[in-house]
């Protein structure tokens, strides 16, 4: 069940990032995908494992963009 949710949330995050090619902050992704912190990290784990995103820290906040 959790594995399925991770895939769904990863898709929501990917869609939000795909609409914003320059990338988004963690806060912007959560707002665009309508998810909470726990789901954000669950989906990000999926996307990072599949090497679909790049993550950096900008002004002490996570910044994510598609590869």
Per-region residue spans from a language model:
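A short, conserved structural fragment
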Residues: 48-58
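Short loop/turn and capping residues at structural boundaries
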Residues: 28, 41, 58-59
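Alpha-helix N-cap/helix-initiation sites
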Residues: 3-7, 22-23, 37, 55
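Short amphipathic alpha-helical interaction segments
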Residues: 35-46
